Design a protein with these regions (language model features):
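Ligand-binding loop in jelly-roll beta-barrel domains
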Residues: 27, 65, 85-111
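A short, N-terminal "cap"/entry segment at the start of jelly-roll beta-barrel domains
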Residues: 1-31, 116-136
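Hydrophobic/aromatic beta-strand elements that line small-molecule binding cavities or substrate pockets
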Residues: 35-36, 79, 89
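Conserved short histidine dyad/triad with adjacent acidic residue
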Residues: 19-21, 34-50
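Glycine- and acidic-residue-biased ligand/ion/polar-headgroup-sensing regions
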Residues: 52-54, 58-64, 69
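Short acidic-glycine-tyrosine-enriched beta hairpin
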Residues: 70-86
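Short, small/polar residue-rich loop motifs at catalytic or cofactor-binding pockets
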Residues: 30, 51-52
């Protein structure tokens, strides 16, 4: 059976449980990601860091905070923070309402594709197939 070329799912933000690991169900091979809901006063039980993986933390709903190398940083809704591998981190909720985060992680490639400076360097444009977008 051939692997799917794409995978689609729907996760209503208000239905997110404590932690929803989505990488495997989505068939991801190079990106790890999850949705996390912390109730007031909840958060990671310990700090951690990585050898090579960087992470991106996005506050989707509510206001929480992240501790980076011992410094607490507020994360109101819409905040996006990239954290390098060696930084100790812990995510939590010190507010009075639930907070929902998206967490993404990836290991850098040994070499960026096609000599580019980003992973987008392996993009193959087809300018003959331009999608039409309709106003609603």
């Amino acid at each position: 059976m051939a692997a799917a070329k794409y995978t689609k799912t729907f996760m209503p933000i208000d239905k997110v449980k404590e932690k929803e690991f989505l990488s495997r169900p989505m068939g991801c091979k190079a990106v790890g990601f999850s949705l996390v809901r912390y109730k007031p006063g909840d958060g990671a039980a310990y700090v951690h860091r990585h050898k090579v993986q960087e992470e991106v933390f996005i506050t989707l709903k509510g206001t929480g905070s992240i501790i980076l190398d011992g410094k607490r940083i507020a994360m109101p809704e819409g905040t996006i923070i990239r954290v390098g591998p060696t930084v100790y981190r812990a995510l939590g909720n010190d507010s009075a309402k639930d907070v929902i985060y998206m967490i993404l992680g990836a290991v850098p490639p040994k070499k960026f594709p096609l000599g580019g400076r980003t992973l987008l360097g392996d993009g193959i444009p087809n300018r003959k197939k331009v999608p039409r977008w309709k106003k609603r």
